[in-house]
Design a protein with these regions (language model features):
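Conserved alpha/beta enzyme-core scaffold
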Residues: 1-421
């Protein structure tokens, strides 16, 4: 039987050792009472390491680096504060690689912290808000500590847990964290309209996170029998399922089911997913599997970027010298869409950020996605289909979707650069 922990007498130093690496569910799956206690007790434990995903709380702050070494696969959310303070190291991994890194021990996870939904009548716990890379960590961690949260949604997935899987349990009753709604600007809405015009009825969608994916979902209300296979599921998915737009009726696998790895939204998606067999959470080994993605007909992958150069190279990691994004799952999904029958690999972004063009002659950060994987690039000014295009043809296409105020400057910069395309 697992040890029963008490919130007012919680001593994690009995379970966590100096030198350990600790992992927990990202975003709204964070077991907040456990992670907060971990940071408060860090000096008592001794130096250890934390592997972060998207951070929707400020549980981990730069001052905690006095004892804690932070690493993450992304700079999203509150991770940006750690990165800007020089307190965060980045794991530049494709999302599909994370389970293998954990299982092989290349990314050793000693302690796993989970937020679970209460046990059912059979004594089985749902993983609640996230599956993702938590399953391989569950199989390899020395210690598994669970917050069993009375308000966590009970979701369907590939695995449930019993007491034998857990070393310690803390019972709580609190609202899970939520994602605030993204602010959709005019440029986002125009981009969404372009993308919606590319999507056929019966297509299966993968969406990244942020204003553009939310705007795209809002622009699809006139479509029929859409499906979803994505890394994350948000409020827009719940709303389109309730409206009968997303039915998953034409998917050639997981028919009738929206598949994702994590719920990334507000109480809207949490409540909708609760005890709902039409939503299933799966491990990253399934959601990002290249063969699974390729097998989905009309698979449309829609992801964002910091900037794209005139030949189709994509920087999804660094903006203005700060690590704000990730290698993440974009390339996994884009390659899946390229292999899918009737698939569409889409990168979408506004043409500008303030006074600066996001269509650039040369990237100001790494080439997260190489130009050999370029598909369709969409801004508010149109669609550049780079598939099968030569470098010169790509430049022409990309200039047409750049902001008109920057087109002449981009041409001048390209001509001034002595290196070939």
């Amino acid at each position: 039987m697992p040890m029963l922990l008490q919130a007012d007498a919680l001593d994690l130093s009995e379970l966590i050792r100096p030198g350990d690496t600790v992992l927990w569910g990202q975003a709204n799956a964070e077991p907040l009472p456990l992670t907060q206690a971990l940071m408060e007790q860090r000096a008592r434990i001794g130096r250890f390491r934390v592997m972060l995903g998207i951070a929707n709380s400020r549980t981990c702050r730069p001052e905690h680096a006095d004892v804690v070494d932070f690493l993450a696969y992304c700079g999203a959310g509150a991770n940006r504060e750690l990165a800007n303070a020089g307190a965060l190291d980045i794991l530049p991994s494709h999302y599909s690689q994370l389970p293998g890194l954990i299982a092989s021990g290349a990314l050793r996870i000693d302690v796993l912290m989970l937020q679970l939904a209460p046990a059912d009548s059979h004594g089985r716990y749902s993983l609640g808000i996230a599956h993702e890379y938590l399953l391989p960590a569950l199989d390899h961690a020395r210690v598994v500590i669970a917050e069993v949260n009375r308000q966590a949604p009970r979701t369907f997935g590939e695995r449930t847990l019993g007491d034998a899987d857990l070393d310690a349990i803390l019972h709580t009753d609190r609202p899970p964290l939520e994602n605030p709604p993204a602010r959709i600007r005019d440029a986002d809405a125009r981009i969404a309209a372009h993308i919606a015009g590319l999507i056929d009825d019966g297509a299966t969608l993968q969406m990244g996170i942020g204003a553009i994916p939310d705007a795209v979902l809002g622009a699809l209300r006139g479509h029929r029998d859409l499906g979803v296979h994505s890394g994350s599921l948000g409020d827009g998915v719940a709303q389109l399922m309730q409206a009968g737009v997303i039915t998953n009726a034409r998917k050639n696998r997981d028919r009738g089911v929206s598949v994702g790895g994590v719920l990334l939204g507000s109480r809207v998606i949490h409540d909708f997913a609760h005890d709902n067999p039409a939503i299933q959470l799966r491990s990253t080994t399934y959601t990002h599997d290249p063969d699974v993605l390729a097998s989905l007909d009309r698979f449309v992958a829609i992801n964002s970027a910091v900037e794209v150069d005139l030949t189709g190279q994509v920087n999804s990691e660094i903006a203005a010298g700060s690590y704000v994004g990730a290698v993440g799952g974009a390339l996994d999904f884009l390659r899946g869409a390229q292999r899918s029958r009737g698939g569409l690999p889409i990168i979408a972004l506004p043409s500008t950020a303030g006074a600066n063009s996001r269509i650039v002659a040369r990237l100001n950060g790494p080439a997260t996605i190489p130009r050999s994987d370029a598909g369709l690039i969409v801004t508010e000014f149109g669609v550049a289909d780079l598939r099968g295009k030569t470098l010169r043809q790509r430049v022409e296409c990309m200039l047409r979707i750049a902001h008109p105020q920057h087109q002449a400057t981009l041409e001048t910069q390209l001509q001034a650069n002595a290196t070939p395309l």
